[in-house]
Amino acid sequence: TMSQIPIGSSMLAGQSLGFNDPFSGSLGWVSRYGDAEVSQYNAAQMIADKWKLSREAMESFALESHRRALSAIQQGFFSREIQPLEELDMDETPRNTSMEKMAELDPLAEGGTITAAVSSQTCDGASGILIVSEEALRRYNLTPRAKIVHMSVRAEDPIWMLTAPIPATEYAMKRSGMRLEDIDLVEINEAFASVPMAWMHETEFPHEKTNVNGGAIALGHPLGATGTKLMTTLLHELERIGGRY
């Protein structure tokens, strides 16, 4: 939940002991990464600057995320993957916005290009998937909906942090013996518009196959639920279009 336990709240644990955050005063950290601010907002801006992503381009990406999400909702694409909670049976955050409305927002940092419009939504939610071994599949006579061909976990410089999908993709393709041309659909979390935009720039993967039903800019990514939420949406969309990977 992002409304009850805000992101970064765990970093306050040491304040009573005189530590404002886990990094300040750490000689090992400073010697390795310097004294740059550790912030997703800062990382998003660094990515936008490095890949020369203009504010207008990011706002256009954000607008398309909302359009795709609203279209998916209207067509009932999410209905199979959502378990209603009392009367709540659809995402509340996608909105009919415009480039003009987004242009009115102030940047998060003076002189920057990252605004609330190109950032993921603050939302609450939960998700889950059931992953079993081949042995359990046979033992319990289960019918699988998908098979994981390869799973990678790759880290990135913590100052940049949000660029990790780029090396993770390269590593996964290498280890699996696959090419991006083999992939039907991809979900790259839209923490900020600059994240999937930089990924698409580096991989040359088409936007038409990326976050096809909108992403976190429109739908949010509740803390602790993002991975399984994206996997669930990806699985349902692959089944809907008859895709394989």
What are these regions (language model features)?
Residues 1-46:
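Flexible glycine-/small-residue-enriched beta->alpha junction loops
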Residues 4-12, 142, 159-161, 222-223:
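Short acidic, glycine/serine/threonine-rich loops at helix termini
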Residues 42-45, 78, 149-218:
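Active-site pocket-lining segment
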Residues 1, 34-40, 96-121, 202-229, ...:
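Conserved catalytic cysteine-centered active-site region
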Residues 57-139, 202, 207-209:
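N-terminal extracellular/periplasmic Venus flytrap/periplasmic-binding protein-like
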Residues 1, 57-64, 82-86, 142-153, ...:
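Beta-strand segments within the central parallel beta-sheet cores of soluble alpha/beta enzyme folds
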Residues 1, 48-77, 129-135, 222-243:
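Active-site-proximal alpha-helical scaffold in enzymes
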Residues 49, 100-163, 167, 171-174, ...:
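Condensing-enzyme catalytic core mediating Claisen C-C bond formation in acyl metabolism
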